[in-house]
């Protein structure tokens, strides 16, 4: 049997880049909660003792940016300089301006255009992907790496492993076979976890706790065997972390946010962007399209691409490839997709309810993946039935 290895990684909510994603989306949530027509392009950067938010926001919402920054950092666990950042004492810098009037008139006519006439906020191309190898219809490498990271955070916050600190990274290598274009996981080849920790714990204790409380509950036993390799804090020491260890920036974990390297990526980040930004809304709708193709049984694996021009409502192109796993020709699946999904930005915002903020709606997406999540706020995960005409 011919097999191959594929690897995906993830990072925890305390990773400095992910901290920035969560701050940007927390600000988006706050704006949309008060003003669903908010136009938000919010970036965040961080380094030792500093968080800065900057970008373009046009909204009637009254938002205390500094308060949101501090509360987001605090919720993650950055409560002292020892762990990498002190939410209550760090410097918070804010440099927010209005959306460019040139962009505003071209995209939404300064809020005068009907939803179906709203243009894309920028050019770009986005990809959605789905595969039948997991119940989430997501790649197993990505699912396991992401769940390991989420479990690290869980056992830190519930004090199962009190020595844990917020920052951390995971990586999983899976051995696969290709069955006519479909991906069949055989076994987990390698598990890598690098997690920030306090001064009280030894490397041996870290390894024991990670295997017992993080790896065992997450990775099904059928995928582990005596040859599975474990690299647990292989650098030997990870006390300094968070923004103290590395600078962070919104939008630097776009593969972790999506499919762990499977499928393809158009390059646009998600966090801090309202739904007129097709980097986000376009990627969400093509995930729904690809997932619906696989869930409906039209293919075992599927990728969908959409592309846009700034100011133009209709997509320039829609593409589908089922990697030769389709039960009907790809051109017929493309027809079904175009009939079932409205790719115009204004209509995507309505159909996926993307103007609704609050309840950490978008902040939740900013750690542990935007896709494959079982949460009613992730409206793009709802399957649309696609039925070929008789």
From Swiss-Prot:
Keyword Lyase: no
Binding-site positions, K(+): 43
Keywords assigned by UniProt, alphabetized: ATP-binding, Cobalt, Cytoplasm, Magnesium, Metal-binding, Nucleotide-binding, One-carbon metabolism, Potassium, Transferase
Cofactor(s) the protein requires to work: Mn(2+); Mg(2+); Co(2+); K(+)
Metabolic or biological pathway: Amino-acid biosynthesis; S-adenosyl-L-methionine biosynthesis; S-adenosyl-L-methionine from L-methionine: step 1/1
Gene Ontology MF term list: ATP binding; metal ion binding; methionine adenosyltransferase activity
InterPro entries: ADOMET_SYNTHASE_CS, S-AdoMet_synt_C, S-AdoMet_synt_central, S-AdoMet_synt_N, S-AdoMet_synthetase, S-AdoMet_synthetase_sfam
Binding-site list for ATP: 15, 167-169, 235-238, 246, 252-253, 269, 273, 277
Entry EC number(s): 2.5.1.6
Compartment list: Cytoplasm
Tissue: Mostly expressed in flowers, seedpods and roots, and, to a lower extent, in stems and leaves.
One Pfam family named in its UniProt record: S-AdoMet_synt_N
Primary site of residence: cytoplasm
Cofactor note text: Binds 2 divalent ions per subunit. The metal ions interact primarily with the substrate. Can utilize magnesium, manganese or cobalt (in vitro). Binds 1 potassium ion per subunit. The potassium ion interacts primarily with the substrate.
Biological processes, Gene Ontology terms: one-carbon metabolic process; S-adenosylmethionine biosynthetic process
Complexes and interactors: Homotetramer.
Family per record: Belongs to the AdoMet synthase family.
Role description: Catalyzes the formation of S-adenosylmethionine from methionine and ATP. The reaction comprises two steps that are both catalyzed by the same enzyme: formation of S-adenosylmethionine (AdoMet) and triphosphate, and subsequent hydrolysis of the triphosphate.
Name this polypeptide is given: S-adenosylmethionine synthase 4
Species: Brassica juncea
């Amino acid at each position: 049997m011919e097999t191959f290895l594929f690897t995906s990684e993830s990072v925890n909510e305390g990773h400095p880049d992910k901290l920035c994603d969560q701050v940007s989306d927390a600000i988006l949530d706050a704006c949309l909660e008060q003003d669903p027509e908010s136009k938000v392009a919010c970036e965040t950067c961080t380094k030792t003792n500093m968080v800065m938010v900057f970008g373009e926001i046009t909204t009637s919402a009254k938002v205390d940016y500094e308060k949101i920054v501090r509360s987001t950092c605090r919720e993650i666990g950055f409560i002292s300089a020892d762990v990498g950042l002190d939410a209550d004492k760090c410097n918070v810098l804010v440099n927010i301006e209005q959306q460019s009037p040139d962009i505003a008139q071209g995209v939404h006519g300064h809020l005068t255009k009907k939803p179906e006439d709203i243009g894309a906020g920028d050019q770009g191309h986005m990809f959605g992907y789905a595969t039948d190898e997991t119940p989430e219809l997501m790649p197993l490498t990505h699912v396991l790496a992401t769940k390991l990271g989420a479990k690290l955070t869980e056992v830190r916050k519930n004090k199962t492993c009190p020595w844990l600190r917020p920052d951390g990274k995971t990586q999983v290598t899976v051995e696969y076979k290709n069955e006519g274009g479909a991906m069949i996981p055989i076994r987990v080849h390698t598990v890598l976890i690098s997690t920030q920790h306090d001064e009280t714990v030894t490397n041996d204790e870290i390894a024991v706790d990670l295997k017992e409380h993080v790896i065992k509950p997450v990775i099904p036993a059928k995928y582990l065997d005596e040859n599975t390799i474990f690299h647990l804090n292989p650098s030997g020491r990870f006390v300094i972390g968070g923004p103290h260890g590395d600078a962070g920036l919104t939008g630097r974990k776009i593969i972790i946010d999506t499919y762990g390297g499977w499928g393809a990526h158009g390059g646009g980040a998600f966090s801090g962007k309202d739904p007129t930004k097709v980097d986000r809304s376009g990627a969400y709708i093509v995930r729904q399209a690809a997932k619906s193709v696989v869930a409906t049984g039209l293919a075992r694996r599927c990728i969908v691409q959409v592309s846009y021009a700034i100011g133009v409502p209709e997509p320039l192109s829609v593409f589908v490839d089922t990697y030769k796993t389709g039960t009907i020709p790809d051109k017929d699946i493309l027809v079904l997709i175009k009939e079932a999904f409205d790719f115009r930005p204004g209509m995507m915002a309505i159909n996926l309810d993307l103007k609704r903020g609050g309840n950490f709606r978008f902040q939740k997406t900013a750690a542990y993946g935007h896709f494959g999540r079982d949460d009613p706020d992730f409206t793009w995960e709802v399957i649309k039935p696609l039925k070929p005409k008789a």
